[in-house]
Amino acid sequence: MLLSPHFWQVDFALDRLTVGLQKTTGMTNENRQKLVAYHEAGHAIMAALTPDYDTVAKVTIIPRSNGAGGFTLFTPSEDRLDSGMYSMRYLKGQLVVALGGRVAEEIVFGKEEVTTGASGDLQQVRNIARRMVAQWGYSKDKLGATSWESPDGNGGFGPAAASAVVEARIDEEVTQLCADAYAACKTMLLDNRILLDELTEMLVEKETVDYQEMQGLIGKYYPDGVNEKMVMPAEAALM
């Protein structure tokens, strides 16, 4: 589960508003705990290793009253919050970060053991990819810098006057964008499996990993920081 609050202060009140009350019983099933830990670690690792992405403020596997088994909390940059504008690079980052949980499950437990816990993440990925192609003009080549969707009056977007051929091309590009993001995410997590495992162990032991602990873990493996060259294999799959 992914969340992006607007402030650095992450406290009980904010948690209650965004993800519901913390369950006092915690998580007792060891297998479920490990699964959720790997899922959330996948999101957090992808965010931490994606240049210029939102800061990971908190990762937890403590269940919530709204049904969430755990969540990863982000702090967006002030510039993005103030402007409300997002670059293509940032949106591609959103795709791979959102897929981090599902991909981590597949890597660790195998395709046959992947759960439905990522359903919301997959919907988010599809929605972002659709808007990139049909609304924001980020088509690779077939559609060009054209918006094929318009506001629907309810805060969302509906189809404009696009032909069946154009709709088919939109679907094709959206599907490919999602597939490329999945492949890029898998490459990154496989290359950083030791980091994924260590963060998971921390979550199983502590249940919650905060900003300072997350920074310390990333710094242990990347003392010189995250740079664009390091993530080029993942970026290349999305170009």
For each predicted feature, which ranges?
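Conserved P-loop NTP-binding catalytic core
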Residues: 21
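Conserved AAA+ ATPase small/helical "lid" subdomain
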Residues: 1-10
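Soluble catalytic regions of large protease machineries
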Residues: 24, 31-38, 44-239
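Contiguous, non-catalytic segments that form substrate-binding/exosite surfaces or channel walls
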Residues: 14
